[in-house]
Amino acid sequence: MLQGPRALASAAGQTPKVVPAMSPTELWPSGLSSPQLCPATATYYTPLYPQTAPPAAAPGTCLDATPHGPEGQVVRCLPAGRLPAKRKLDLEGIGRPVVPEFPTPKGKCIRVDGLPSPKTPKSPGEKTRYDTSLGLLTKKFIYLLSESEDGVLDLNWAAEVLDVQKRRIYDITNVLEGIQLIRKKAKNNIQWVGRGMFEDPTRPGKQQQLGQELKELMNTEQALDQLIQSCSLSFKHLTEDKANKRLAYVTYQDIRAVGNFKEQTVIAVKAPPQTRLEVPDRTEDNLQIYLKSTQGPIEVYLCPEEVQEPDSPSEEPLPSTSTLCPSPDSAQPSSSTDPSIMEPTASSVPAPAPTPQQAPPPPSLVPLEATDSLLELPHPLLQQTEDQFLSPTLACSSPLISFSPSLDQDDYLWGLEAGEGISDLFDSYDLGDLLIN
């Protein structure tokens, strides 16, 4: 702020005087100028950045100096050569990203009468910008891909059909391959790997139907599990009951009485506990069954469809239930007989009801042939059950056909005589020097 001379300012405590009006030229003389600044020393300023010495100016130029005249006027020196180019220095925008200014849209030219100018019609052979757009080309490419077999498309054929350059096709395939919708199957061949294009339109209905069937199968499986559990519990109670153990057998008539077994081949298997049964995959030609047991022998019988029965009970009377069919062992003579050793017969089984024509004979005991020792008796290998004491008709003329031959006396373990030792049990083996040592 410029202040006037002190002579013009009123002193404190004095009455201000009226200053006559003066013109600006009278107030500020023409020879008055700004005071000259005193030169500062070189150590007064501290350089912030290392500075290099400016290049020496060419002779006759004044580009690096701005001399002041006696009245503070800038003196410009004209260069001897070419004039320097004018450059606008943006000191405030250093380090900021340059944002291009949005150009002001130009308004449409409107005729004086207010009607828009008519557009110039294009030639019929010229394509519009929409026809050559990448979006429309992608739609056409996807349509060709959907019509191809197994989703495999030849890029050369697609470029010919779409009438475009091959690089335009590559622009589409690069994007689709990047989002994992297609994959390169071979050279110039791609395959669609996405979903939704080649799916059956009736798939949702089929999926719903399969879900309903799966639900029904789960209900059926649950019902079968309950039945299996109930049958297992009933079978456990049946087998653990002592009164039912003696009746744990089935007859031929019982098997043939089952309606589902009619006109079918029935094979009866009598196996010890823990017998393993394996049935491989069934084929149309044959059926294979594998039985394996480590607890004892397995007996297999065939139940024929037709059995020859006697004409009438009066023509051929039934034998007594107290007698059994003679076995091959009983036909051989024996040196001695022990009447105290008896085999239980079928007399304990209730006899059939008597008929008016013939009364049942009184029960009797038939002694079996005994040997010198109990070890010489052909003891059965399996525990005797109630089915071994049936009537003679079922025992002698049983309709069951055994697949294995009947056992003879050579298949049993016999005892030793008085003059025989333990080595006689191994007479069929050549032990050599083992007996000497």
UniProtKB/Swiss-Prot annotation:
Residues 351-365 have a biased composition (Pro residues). It is found in: Nucleus. One of its GO terms (biological process) is negative regulation of sprouting angiogenesis. A motif (DEF box) lies at residues 160-196. The keyword Cytoplasm does not apply. Residues 307-368 are annotated as: Disordered. Keywords: Activator, Cell cycle, DNA-binding, Nucleus, Phosphoprotein, Transcription, Transcription regulation. Residues 315-330 have a biased composition (Low complexity). Residues 410-427 are annotated as: Retinoblastoma protein binding. One of its GO terms (molecular function) is protein dimerization activity. Highest level of expression is found in placenta, low levels are found in lung. Found as well in many immortalized cell lines derived from tumor samples. SUPFAM superfamilies: E2F-DP heterodimerization region, Winged helix' DNA-binding domain. It holds the Pfam family E2F_CC-MB. The keyword Magnesium does not apply. Transcription activator that binds DNA cooperatively with DP proteins through the E2 recognition site, 5'-TTTC[CG]CGC-3' found in the promoter region of a number of genes whose products are involved in cell cycle regulation or in DNA replication. The DRTF1/E2F complex functions in the control of cell-cycle progression from g1 to s phase. E2F2 binds specifically to RB1 in a cell-cycle dependent manner. This is Transcription factor E2F2. It comes from Homo sapiens.
